[in-house]
Amino acid sequence: MKKPKYLYHGSGKKIKVLEPRKPTDSDPMHSKKGVYATSLKKVALGMAAARSAKTSAFKNRKTHVINIIEGWPDLKATVYLHILDPKDFKQNHKDEYLSMKKVKPIKIEEHKVSDLKHLWRKSSKKELKEFLKDREAWRAPGDRKIKAIFFDF
């Protein structure tokens, strides 16, 4: 499969050099220490917006819209889209890529969370159930084995 022209990493911080680190979510696909990025600009922005406040969220597999389970994005916050060269990245899973090296962004864009409302919505129970179907390690909010679902890529 051909690599995309650019990859994207969303964050609440403007980061000059992205350093490999271990994600905080419970997905086994995110067990490696690295710099996580996506080929989908709207996913990087949507996840950064969701993380602008304490939320539990997941990406809808079909629409790529971010489904919020708990909490709500901070509409007053600003997030940053780090545009990356894919040369040091390998595909981890579908539209997700991973680099084991430090990555310097080609460009960094600033976005107001209030301008990104089209990238997320409140999740229905049906959507959450579908999402959790093949993810035994994940737990819905309220299940105290794992407090909540957090993304950090």
Where are these regions (language model features)?
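Short, well-structured hydrophobic secondary-structure segments
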Residues: 34-54
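Compositionally biased, intrinsically disordered low-complexity regions
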Residues: 12-14, 36, 73, 144
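Short, solvent-exposed loop/turn segments at secondary-structure junctions
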Residues: 13-15, 42-44, 87-89
